[in-house]
């Protein structure tokens, strides 16, 4: 490997929205995520709807019931 071209790795904490903290190494000291293996439905086995940033609500506001009536 060439000297001086690789980013410096530091101990990092990955912090999930559910409160889970994962210790690892990265170029950033803290990384924030919305879901992790402790709360994601695929890993927990629970049927749960994951809505990021209110996309369903935004769609409902924009189109409302007119979307369903056209079908």
Curated annotation (Swiss-Prot):
Q: Which Pfam families match?
A: Ribosomal_L31 (PF01197)
> Does the keyword Zinc-finger belong to this entry?
no
Q: Name one GO cellular component term.
A: ribosome
Q: How is the cofactor bound?
A: Binds 1 zinc ion per subunit.
NCBIfam families listed in its UniProt record: L31, PRK00019.1, PRK00528.1
Tell me which family the UniProt entry assigns to this protein.
Belongs to the bacterial ribosomal protein bL31 family. Type A subfamily.
**Protein name as annotated:** Large ribosomal subunit protein bL31
Species, as recorded: Thermus thermophilus (strain ATCC BAA-163 / DSM 7039 / HB27)
Which gene name belongs to this protein? rpmE
């Amino acid at each position: 490997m060439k000297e001086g071209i690789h980013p410096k790795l530091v101990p990092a904490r990955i912090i999930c929205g559910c409160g889970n903290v994962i210790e690892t190494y990265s170029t950033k000291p803290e990384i924030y995520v919305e879901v992790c293996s402790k709360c994601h439905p695929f890993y927990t086995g629970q049927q749960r709807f994951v809505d990021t940033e209110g996309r369903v609500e935004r769609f409902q506001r924009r189109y409302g019931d007119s979307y369903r009536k056209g079908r």
